[in-house]
Each structure stands twice: as structure tokens, then as C-alpha cells.
């Protein structure tokens, strides 16, 4: 793939103007300070619980739970990727993706409000639902596919979208859902974890919040826990910031610095991983023992049409089902280049049988495969070999 915002194999969810820098340039330059002679290009992490603060306490940095220069640079970088060239977008970073998700839901909703969540999303969402309901908030759920959340929007205060969904990889029409939600007075938050800001821009599609776990492909090395929220509405973002301060859901300076460093290679990583994911999906579709193969980049995938209208890249996750739990476990054990792990988006390929957790409504033989940055031919060969060696 090229470093432009759109490619021949990806969708048209955002257009690049002739004068705008490409994704690779933006990723490398995102959030960097103005150059100062003899100073580093990307300053190191600032470790500080407090700052010099004589007299009037007004200023950007007062106490370590409120602000940190290392966060500020990272927030600027992510904002430049989520809404390129757009002023007025604020980004806040958090200690994890769940901290970011919770910050939006618990800062925007009150007892008596109604929230709409996907019933096929991230496996921690049922825990969030239970907590919301304990606070007197009504929660309705519907699947991601076929825009089913439209049917339960009436009277909602907030709509939560996860597209593509994890782990099923269904896609919904963000623009259509946003239009309907806003017409009824609801806010819209989109979990953009699987797509990344280079694969989908929820704010451009009309959403009020773009939320993600930076632990996954955004940072991509499997060594950082991080989350973020980006939004345009100053009042809504002030509430998110206040929630972060109250609960202390802040990232460490080292994590923030590692994340910023990693963003420089984001375009290189997503293009390699996403193009390899398509090759993997094309190879797996020929196997008779595999059913339910999903990858939004496949032209015949049920999600492809909608995905091609709003996504710039299709992600690095492929899902499929093997005939049984035993076959799936043998297949995973036989892999040599794919690590058994419960995350996705890293440079090292990972896979797991999602049914082992009990939180996803998937078949026992369902596999979520996160495609890494290995050589495509090597990875495909490893997957096919493992399938051959574990034939029943």
C-alpha cells in the first residue's frame, strides 16, 4: 500500500487533498515540538508528580495527575491522526482502553438515561453494562451488523458503536447511525480500536467521540497499555477530562513516550499487517475445514460494501471457525510463527480460541487471528502447515 490516505485495496472513508501530507508523513511528524537547537526531536518522558508552582497556580502543568508534557505531545499526535488538519479536536490519553471507554460512558450518562451498546462487542462491555445499570442507567443492546442498533435508539442519551466489531468483524454504517442518533438527541461514540486512525476516522463520519485502546495496533509492540478519547465538543470533553482527574485513570510518562515513539511507524505497520491479513484470508478461504471466515477486506465479505464506504484500511484481524474445540486447540499448538495471546494489533502475529474466555457468543472452534509484520509467505505457509498437520 502507498502512504496516501486511500489505496486501491482499501475503502474511501476519507479523502486526501492534493496538498495534504500522506499518512506516513503525518505519523512520523505527529505531535513533535518545534525544533530547538541541541534539543532532541522527541523529548524524553517527563517524570514529575509536581511542578514548580510559586504564586498564581494558573498554567499548563500544576500536578502530575492533571497534566504532563509527555501526555500533551502524545495527545497532539493522536489528534492529528484522528482529525488531520482540523482545529478544535481535543484528545485525552488514559491508562488503558477500558479507562477511556469508561470515561465517556460514566462522564456523559446519569441515572435515568438510556445507553445503547453492541451485544457483540468487546468482552468487557457486559461488565460495563452491569455497572451502568447499578447506577440507574438503562442499557439496551443490539448486534453491530445490519445497523441493528437503529431499532433500539428511541430515547437514548448515548449510542456506543464498535466497528469493525471484536471479535466477529461485523461493520455498521457509522454515518447512518450517527444521523439517526443525533436526530433523537443522542451522542455517538465509536470504538476505533481495530481500525486505528489510519483505517477509519469516526469524527469525520459524524461521531462525537472516537475512543480506542492504544494497547493494540496504534502502538503495536505489545509493551504498552494505553487508551484515548478524541472529540470536538468542548463541554463533553471537559466532562471526560474531569472524570480522568477524579479517578486518576492516567498513563505513566514512560508509557506515553513509548506510545508516541511507536506512532512514527504506524503507517508502515498497518500497511504491512493489513495487506498480509488480506493474503492470509485469501489463503484460508480455500480450506474446506474452515467456516465463517471473516475479513472486511475480502470483496465477498458481508461487511465489505459498508466497510469500503467508510474505512481507509481494513485492519489486521481475521476470524474463522474450525470444526471443534479440539481441532482449534491442536491447530493453535501447531503454529510456529503465531503466538498464543489474547491481544491483537502487534507486530508479532497472535491467535486464540475466543471461546475459552466464555464472554463471547462464538462457536467453540472460533479463532481470532491477529496478523503481524512477518513475511506474508512465511506466515501463510505456517498457517497452512498447521492446518495440514492437525487434520481430523
From Swiss-Prot:
Keywords linked to the UniProt accession: Amino-acid biosynthesis, Cysteine biosynthesis, Cytoplasm, Lyase, Pyridoxal phosphate
Leading EC class: lyase
Enzyme Commission numbers on file: 4.4.1.1
GO CC annotation terms, alphabetical: cytoplasm
One Pfam family in the UniProt entry: Cys_Met_Meta_PP
UniProt-listed InterPro entries: Cys/Met-Metab_PyrdxlP-dep_enz, Cys_met_metab_PP, PyrdxlP-dep_Trfase, PyrdxlP-dep_Trfase_major, PyrdxlP-dep_Trfase_small
Catalyzed reaction equations: L,L-cystathionine + H2O = 2-oxobutanoate + L-cysteine + NH4(+)
SUPFAM superfamilies: PLP-dependent transferases
Lyase as UniProt keyword: yes
This protein's record includes keyword Amino-acid biosynthesis: yes
GO MF annotation: an example: pyridoxal phosphate binding
Domain of life, per lineage: Bacteria
Cellular localisation: Cytoplasm
Cofactor annotation: pyridoxal 5'-phosphate
Comp. bias intervals (Polar residues): 1-10
Residue numbers spanned by region Disordered: 1-41
GO biological processes: cysteine biosynthetic process via cystathionine; transsulfuration
Pathway annotation from the record: Amino-acid biosynthesis; L-cysteine biosynthesis; L-cysteine from L-homocysteine and L-serine: step 2/2
Residue(s) carrying N6-(pyridoxal phosphate)lysine: 216
Similarity comment text for this entry: Belongs to the trans-sulfuration enzymes family.
Protein name (database record): Putative cystathionine gamma-lyase
Source organism of this protein record: Streptomyces coelicolor (strain ATCC BAA-471 / A3(2) / M145)
Gene this protein is translated from: cysA
Amino acid at each position: 500500500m502507498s502512504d496516501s490516505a486511500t489505496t486501491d485495496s482499501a475503502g474511501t472513508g476519507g479523502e486526501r487533498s492534493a496538498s495534504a501530507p500522506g499518512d506516513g508523513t503525518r505519523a512520523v511528524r505527529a505531535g513533535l515540538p518545534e525544533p530547538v537547537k541541541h534539543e532532541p526531536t522527541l523529548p524524553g518522558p517527563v517524570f514529575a508528580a509536581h511542578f514548580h508552582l510559586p504564586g498564581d497556580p494558573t498554567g499548563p502543568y500544576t500536578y502530575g495527575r492533571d497534566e504532563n508534557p509527555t501526555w500533551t505531545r502524545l495527545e497532539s499526535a493522536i489528534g492529528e491522526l484522528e482529525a488531520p488538519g482540523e482545529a478544535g479536536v481535543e484528545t485525552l490519553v488514559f491508562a488503558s482502553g477500558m479507562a477511556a471507554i469508561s470515561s465517556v460512558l460514566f462522564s456523559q450518562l446519569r441515572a435515568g438515561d438510556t445507553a445503547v451498546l453492541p451485544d457483540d462487542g468487546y468482552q468487557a462491555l457486559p461488565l460495563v453494562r452491569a455497572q451502568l445499570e447499578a447506577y440507574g442507567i438503562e442499557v439496551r443492546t443490539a448486534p453491530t451488523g445490519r445497523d441493528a442498533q437503529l431499532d433500539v435508539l428511541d430515547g437514548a442519551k448515548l449510542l456506543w458503536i464498535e466497528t469493525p466489531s471484536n471479535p466477529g468483524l461485523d461493520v455498521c454504517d457509522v454515518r447512518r447511525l450517527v444521523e439517526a442518533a443525533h436526530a433523537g438527541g443522542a451522542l455517538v461514540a465509536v470504538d476505533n480500536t481495530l481500525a486505528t486512525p489510519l483505517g477509519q476516522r469516526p469524527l469525520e463520519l459524524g461521531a462525537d467521540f472516537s475512543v480506542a485502546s492504544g494497547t493494540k495496533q496504534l502502538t503495536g509492540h505489545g509493551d504498552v497499555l494505553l487508551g484515548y478519547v478524541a472529540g470536538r465538543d468542548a463541554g463533553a470533553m471537559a466532562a471526560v477530562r474531569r472524570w480522568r482527574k477524579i479517578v486518576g485513570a492516567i498513563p505513566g510518562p514512560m508509557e506515553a513516550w513509548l506510545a508516541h515513539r511507536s506512532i512514527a511507524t504506524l503507517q508502515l505497520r498497518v500497511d504491512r499487517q493489513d495487506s498480509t491479513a488480506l493474503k492470509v484470508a485469501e489463503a484460508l478461504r480455500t480450506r474446506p475445514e474452515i467456516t465463517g471466515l471473516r475479513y472486511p477486506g475480502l470483496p465477498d465479505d458481508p461487511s465489505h460494501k459498508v466497510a469500503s464506504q467508510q474505512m481507509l484500511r481494513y485492519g489486521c484481524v481475521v476470524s474463522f471457525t474450525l470444526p471443534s474445540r479440539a481441532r482449534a486447540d491442536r491447530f493453535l499448538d501447531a503454529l510456529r510463527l503465531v503466538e498464543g495471546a489474547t491481544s491483537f494489533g502487534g507486530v508479532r502475529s497472535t491467535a486464540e480460541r475466543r471461546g475459552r474466555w466464555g464472554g463471547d457468543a462464538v462457536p467453540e472452534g472460533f479463532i481470532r487471528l491477529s496478523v503481524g509484520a512477518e513475511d506474508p509467505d512465511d506466515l501463510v505457509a505456517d498457517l497452512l502447515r498447521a492446518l495440514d498437520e492437525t487434520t481430523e
